[in-house]
C-alpha cells in the first residue's frame, strides 16, 4: 500500500493540546496515513532559543501523534515569515507530502485574491515583508480589502505564496485555531488550550498547576525534568560578542544593516540583562522578533551565504513505525541527502550552521546536540 502524507510546519515550543488537536484534524480532513512535521531545530522563528532542545521536542511530538519529524534548518527557521515559509514548503515538498495543514485565525482567507495583488516589483515586496511589515499589510488591505494582521494569517499567506512559487506541490488545508491567540501571554483558567507563549512563561516560572491542563502528559513530564532555556542563558555570550566585535565585522553578518550594529553595541554596554538590552534597542522601526533574530545572527556569527532558506539536506529527528515505513517508501525518490546520523562530513559541510546552533545550546546545557545523535524511534507501546 502506498502511504500518503500530510505535512505540518511547526516549532512545538512546546507541544501542547492545540497541536494535538491539529494533528487529529489533519488526519480527519485529509485521510493521510502519515503526519510529517517540519520542525524548527534549537532556535525558532521568533529569534529565540527553543525552551527544550529539538530531541526533547521530537519526543513530545511523536508521543502526540506525529509520525515523522524532520528538522527545519536554522537557515530557514531563523528567518522572516516569507523566507521561513519558503524553506518549510520546500522541505515538505521534497518529502513528498500531499497536503500542508496549518492553523490560522481565518481559515476562509482568500489567498488567491491576496496573491493576485502582490507588489509587482520584487524589491518593494522584499522591503515590505522584511522591514516594513505593517506597510506591507496596509498595502494588501488597500488593494483587496482583506486585513492580514494576525500572526498565523500572515504565515498562512506566505505558505500560499511559497507553494505557488514552487509549483503548488502541496494542497493547502487551513484549520481554524482552537483556543487562545498566538501571542497571548497568560493561560486562561478553566481551559484546555493556551498559547505556546503563555505556556513557556508559566513553565519558566515553574507554575506546573497552570501548565498541566493545557499540555499532554508527555510534554509536562519533559518540561519538569529538563533544564529549560531562554535568551537569558545566552546573554553573557551575546554581550561579549557585541562588545568585543568591531562594527566592520558585525556588518558582515546576516541582515545587520542600516547602522543597527551601532545601536546593538551601545545597548550591550549599557544593559545588564537580555530584557534590558531588548528594551534599549527597541524602536518603532523594528519588531522585537526582528531584533531577536539579529541578535541570534550575531551570536551565531551567521554570514549571508549561510542563510539561504532552501534546504541543502534533510535531518531526520524521529519517527514512529509508520513514519519509518514512509521513509523507506520515499528514500529513493528524495532529491536531497537524508541525514540520520550527523558525522564529521556533515559538520564541516552542509550541516555547519546547524552544528554551531547546537554547539551554542551545548555550551549552556552540556547536552550534545548533533554529532553522533540518531533519530528517536517512538516505542510501539505508545
UniProtKB/Swiss-Prot annotation:
It comes from the Bacteria. GO terms for cellular component: cytoplasm. InterPro entries: Rossmann-like_a/b/a_fold, tRNA(Met)_cyd_acetate_ligase. ATP binds at residues 9-22, 103, 152, 177. It comes from Levilactobacillus brevis (strain ATCC 367 / BCRC 12310 / CIP 105137 / JCM 1170 / LMG 11437 / NCIMB 947 / NCTC 947) (Lactobacillus brevis). The lineage of its organism: Bacteria, Bacillati, Bacillota, Bacilli, Lactobacillales. This is tRNA(Met) cytidine acetate ligase. The keyword tRNA processing applies. Belongs to the TmcAL family. Its EC number is 6.3.4.-. The keyword Ligase applies. Pfam families: HIGH_NTase1.
Amino acid at each position: 500500500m502506498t502511504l500518503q502524507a500530510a505535512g505540518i510546519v511547526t516549532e512545538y515550543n512546546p507541544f501542547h493540546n492545540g497541536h494535538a488537536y491539529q494533528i487529529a484534524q489533519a488526519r480527519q480532513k485529509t485521510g493521510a496515513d502519515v503526519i510529517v512535521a517540519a520542525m524548527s531545530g534549537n532556535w525558532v522563528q521568533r529569534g529565540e532559543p527553543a525552551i527544550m532542545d529539538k530531541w526533547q521536542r521530537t519526543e513530545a511530538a511523536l508521543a502526540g501523534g506525529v509520525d515523522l519529524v524532520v528538522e527545519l534548518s536554522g537557515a530557514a527557521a531563523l528567518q522572516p515569515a516569507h523566507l521561513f515559509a519558503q524553506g518549510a514548503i520546500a522541505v515538505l515538498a521534497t518529502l513528498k507530502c500531499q497536503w500542508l495543514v496549518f492553523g490560522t485565525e481565518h481559515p476562509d482567507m482568500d489567498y488567491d485574491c491576496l496573491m493576485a495583488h502582490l507588489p509587482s516589483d520584487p524589491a518593494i515586496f522584499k522591503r515590505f515583508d522584511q522591514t516594513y511589515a505593517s506597510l506591507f499589510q496596509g498595502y494588501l488591505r488597500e488593494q483587496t480589502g482583506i486585513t492580514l494582521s494576525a500572526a498565523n494569517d500572515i504565515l498562512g499567506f506566505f505558505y500560499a505564496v511559497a507553494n505557488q512559487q514552487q509549483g503548488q506541490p502541496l494542497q493547502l488545508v487551513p484549520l481554524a485555531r482552537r483556543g487562545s491567540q498566538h501571542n497571548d501571554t497568560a493561560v486562561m483558567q478553566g481551559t484546555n488550550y493556551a498559547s505556546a507563549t503563555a505556556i513557556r512563561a508559566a513553565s519558566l516560572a515553574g507554575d506546573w498547576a497552570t501548565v498541566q491542563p493545557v499540555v499532554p502528559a508527555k510534554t509536562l513530564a519533559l518540561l519538569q525534568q529538563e533544564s529549560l532555556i531562554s535568551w537569558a542563558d545566552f546573554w553573557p555570550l551575546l554581550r561579549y560578542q557585541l562588545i568585543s566585535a568591531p562594527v566592520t565585522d558585525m556588518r558582515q553578518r546576516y541582515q545587520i544593516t542600516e547602522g543597527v550594529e551601532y545601536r546593538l553595541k551601545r545597548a550591550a554596554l549599557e544593559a545588564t540583562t537580555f530584557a534590558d538590552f531588548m528594551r534599549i534597542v527597541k524602536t518603532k522601526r523594528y519588531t522585537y522578533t526582528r531584533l531577536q533574530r539579529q541578535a541570534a545572527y550575531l551570536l551565531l556569527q551567521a554570514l549571508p551565504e549561510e542563510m539561504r532558506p532552501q534546504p541543502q539536506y534533510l535531518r531526520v529527528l524521529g519517527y514512529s513505525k509508520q513514519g519509518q515505513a514512509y521513509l523507506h517508501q520515499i528514500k529513493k525518490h528524495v532529491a536531497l541527502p537524508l541525514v540520520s546520523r550527523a558525522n564529521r562530513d556533515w559538520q564541516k559541510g552542509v550541516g555547519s550552521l546547524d552544528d554551531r546552533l547546537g554547539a551554542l545550546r551545548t555550551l549552556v546545557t552540556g547536552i550534545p546536540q548533533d554529532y553522533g545523535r540518531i533519530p528517536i524511534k517512538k516505542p510501539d507501546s505508545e
